[in-house]
Design a protein with these regions (language model features):
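Short, contiguous pre-domain boundary segments
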Residues: 19-20, 296-303
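Mobile gating loops/cap/lid regions near enzyme active sites that modulate substrate access
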Residues: 247-254
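A recurrent short beta-strand within the Rossmann-like NAD(P)-dependent oxidoreductase core
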Residues: 169, 231-232, 274, 287-290, ...
Length: 336
C-alpha cells in the first residue's frame, strides 16, 4: 500500500532540492475524453496552462472560474480557437466573497457531470489588507474561501462523478507551507493569528495560509471516503512566467524573478503536477499532499501528539468560521 502523507517522516523544506527534482511527465496515454472539469483561476498562469493541457488530453467540457469574466473570456477565446470540439465556459467566482463562492457552488449543481475540480485561485499580498468579509485577504482567498468552496463541492462531486468512479478534488498548495511554525500550547488559537496585523509578514503569512490546509485535509480524509471523493493538495513548485508575486514589494520581485530564471519549472511542468494529482494518480493520494510529483510529508507541525491537537484545533476553528453554511452537516452528508 502506498504510504500517505501522514505515514511519512517530515523534514525541513529544501527549496533547491525540490526545484531540481526529477520531472515526471503526464503519461502519454492519459485521456480525459468525455470528462467535465472545473479549474478556478484559469484565466492566466498555471491555471490557464492546466486548462490548455487538459483540453489537449481530450477534455470535453471546461468551466473556467474567474473573478473577472472579461479576462476569463479572453482566455476562453484562445482555448476555443485551438480546441474547437470542446465546450469552454466562463463562470464567475470571487474568492473574496462568501456569497459569490456559494453562488458558484450552486451553479455547479446544475452540471450533468463533473469529473474533477482543481481549485487554483490564490494570491500573495505584500501589505496587510482586510477584505469585505473582515479577514486578511490572503487568509480569505487561500484558506477560508478555498475550504468553503471545497466543502460545498463535495456532495456535487460525489453525485455528478461518472458511475463507478469517485469525484476528484485537487487544491493547489505551496512548498512554502512546509515552513511556518505553529503554537504548541492548548490555549493558543490558530486561525485568529492570520487576521492579526501585528503578526503580518508577507511571505510567512502567505505560507501560513497554505499550511492550514495540511491540518484540515487530515481531518477531512477521516470523514470522507476516497470511494466517494478523492481530495488532495498539490504544490506545483516555483514556475517561470507566473504572476503570483505581482503584489510583492518591488525590491523583492526582481529577486524572485532571478530565482525563477535559474531554478523555475516550465509552465508545462508546473501544470503537470495538477494533472497528476487530479487525473493520473488514484485513491492513494486521498488526504495527502503532493510535491515533486509524489506523495510528500506535511508541515512538521501536523505530526506527533501536539500535531493531533493542532489538527483538531484547526478543524474546529474552521468549522466555526464557516458555520454560517453548516459545513459540518455538508461533510456529514458525504461521510463514510
Amino acid at each position: 500500500m502506498t504510504p500517505k502523507s501522514l505515514d511519512l517522516t517530515p523534514g525541513p523544506f529544501r527549496f533547491f532540492h525540490s526545484q531540481l527534482a526529477k520531472y515526471i511527465p503526464v503519461p502519454k496515454d492519459t485521456s480525459v475524453a468525455g470528462a467535465t472539469a472545473i479549474v478556478t483561476g484559469a484565466n492566466g498562469g498555471l491555471g490557464y496552462q492546466c486548462a490548455h493541457d487538459l483540453l489537449a488530453l481530450g477534455l470535453s467540457r471546461l468551466i473556467i472560474a474567474v473573478r473577472t469574466p472579461s479576462k476569463g473570456e479572453e482566455a476562453a477565446a484562445k482555448l476555443r480557437q485551438k480546441f474547437k470540439s470542446a465546450t469552454v465556459e466562463v463562470w464567475r467566482v470571487d474568492m473574496l466573497s462568501y456569497e459569490s463562492v456559494q453562488a458558484f457552488a450552486a451553479n455547479c449543481e446544475t452540471l450533468d457531470r463533473i469529473d474533477f475540480a482543481i481549485l487554483n485561485a490564490g494570491l500573495i499580498e505584500d501589505k496587510f489588507k482586510l477584505g469585505p468579509e473582515g479577514h486578511e485577504v490572503m487568509f480569505q482567498v487561500n484558506y477560508l474561501s478555498t475550504i468553503l468552496l471545497a466543502v460545498l463541492l463535495l456532495p456535487t462531486l460525489k453525485r455528478k462523478a461518472p458511475s463507478g468512479s469517485p469525484g476528484r478534488l485537487t487544491i493547489v498548495n505551496s512548498g512554502t507551507a512546509l515552513m511556518p511554525k505553529f503554537p504548541n500550547t492548548p490555549s493558543d488559537q490558530v486561525l485568529p493569528e492570520c487576521d492579526d496585523a501585528s503578526k503580518f509578514v508577507a511571505m510567512n503569512s502567505y505560507a501560513r495560509t497554505k499550511a492550514l490546509a495540511h491540518f484540515w485535509i487530515v481531518k477531512l480524509a477521516e470523514r470522507v471516503s476516497a470511494k466517494d471523493v478523492v481530495v488532495n493538495l498539490v504544490d506545483p513548485g516555483l514556475v517561470k512566467g507566473t504572476d503570483l508575486h505581482r503584489s510583492m514589494n518591488p525590491f523583492v520581485r526582481p529577486i524572485i524573478t532571478a530565482v525563477k530564471s535559474l531554478t523555475g519549472r516550465t509552465m508545462e511542468q508546473g501544470a503537470s503536477t495538477f494533472i497528476q494529482a487530479a487525473v493520473v494518480l488514484g485513491e492513494e493520494t486521498h488526504g495527502s499532499y503532493l510535491m515533486d510529483w509524489i506523495i510528500f510529508p506535511y508541515n512538521m507541525a501536523v505530526y506527533g501528539p501536539n500535531g493531533e491537537t493542532l489538527r483538531d484545533r484547526v478543524w474546529n476553528e474552521t468549522l466555526k468560521a464557516l458555520s454560517f453554511v453548516d459545513i459540518e452537516k455538508i461533510i456529514s452528508s458525504v461521510s463514510r
